[in-house]
Amino acid sequence: MTRRFFLVLLCIIAAGAQASAQAKTTVVILVRHAEKAAAPAADPPLTEAGVARARALATALADANVRAVITTELIRTRETARPLADALGLPLETVHTGTGGVHARAVADAVRAHAGQTVLVVGHSNTIPLIIAALSGPKFGDICDTQYSNLFVLIVRPGDKKTGLVVSSYGAPSPDAATTCPGSMK
């Protein structure tokens, strides 16, 4: 799995360099927030495992040429993104949660405001698939509630009707979705 991760990271870096060469090609990296505490239920912070995953994300993307970081207003997305944003000296751009499709389109608009750059989006298990679809990526099933290690990479080119998607992982492995959430994305 480590080898696969580094191959994907190499692709991200290469795509970032390509994005610089092609003025409007945008690399979008999407992750679900890291592991969250059980309370408070409405807006929990990260657990110790989540804090470790947020640091792993910062390490994994340190050389990926990220130029913008988009989160929701919820603590768990902001805490997941903050180590990378702080390391790169980038502000966290907030897109408020709301109805799924409306939120996904708002995130897609925020990404498009950074055309030609590499953008990190930290979302939720129920918003990441919608955001990918809003950016013309392929549709897929829900992300299992126990899955935190997925890393999705989209290469968005102006005029393309469909956007390619690479799925990888980072940090500690999540439990096997086949046993914890049958029928969801693995």
Stretches with model-predicted labels:
Residues 17-22:
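Sec/Tat signal peptide C-region and signal peptidase I cleavage site
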Residues 1-4:
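Positively charged n-region of N-terminal signal peptides that target proteins for export
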Residues 23-115, 128-130, 134, 139-151, ...:
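Active-site-proximal alpha-helix that buttresses catalytic centers in soluble enzyme cores
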Residues 6-16:
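Bacterial N-terminal signal peptides
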Residues 125:
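Long, charged/polar, surface-exposed segments that mediate recognition or autoinhibition
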